Design a protein with these regions (language model features):
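Membrane-interface interhelical linkers
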Residues: 1-15, 24-73, 77-88, 118-120
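Residue-level hotspots within transmembrane alpha-helices of multi-pass secondary transporters
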Residues: 20, 80, 107-108
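Hydrophobic transmembrane alpha-helices of multi-pass small-molecule transport proteins
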Residues: 121-137
Length: 138
């Protein structure tokens, strides 16, 4: 198994657990921005520790900073919408599969922007992804 696959699986479990914690928090009706801000502060602390351990200089560029800000805005909006859906009575077993379709958007954008090849395997994956969401949300 490649390191990329291993790290992808680690991310799968970490994000899955994060989503479960969001659902776990919703019965107490938290104010979503405060919950997500605490989560964001925790993110900054963990990334700072990783940065210190790696002893790599902090570097950025205007382009990279712009991409990070746009990504932060999108992630904040997506997190807030997901959390709001859960706190408004959305079942995790329905909300998470729908939100999980975000990989299709990222894949389509990668194909368009980076000219990645469209393979039969990817097309079948898209079809199965959509079909799985239909089954999981009924």
């Amino acid at each position: 198994m490649s390191i990329a696959t291993t790290l992808s699986l680690a991310a799968l479990f970490a994000f899955g657990f994060t989503n479960f914690l969001w659902k776990l928090a919703t019965p107490s009706k938290p104010y979503q921005p405060s919950y997500l801000m605490i989560q964001g502060i925790t993110y900054i602390i963990v990334m700072s520790i990783i940065h210190i351990i790696q002893t790599h200089p902090f570097t950025t560029s205007p382009k990279l900073a712009s991409l990070a800000v746009m990504g932060g805005i999108c992630a904040s909006m997506g997190s807030f919408a997901t959390f709001l859906a859960l706190s408004r009575g959305g079942e995790g077993s329905k909300v998470f599969p729908i939100v999980g379709l975000n990989v299709i958007i990222a894949t389509i954008l990668s194909i368009i922007v980076f000219h990645e090849p469209i393979t039969i395997q990817k097309l079948i994956g898209f079809i199965f992804g959509v079909i799985s969401i239909i089954f999981l949300t009924r």
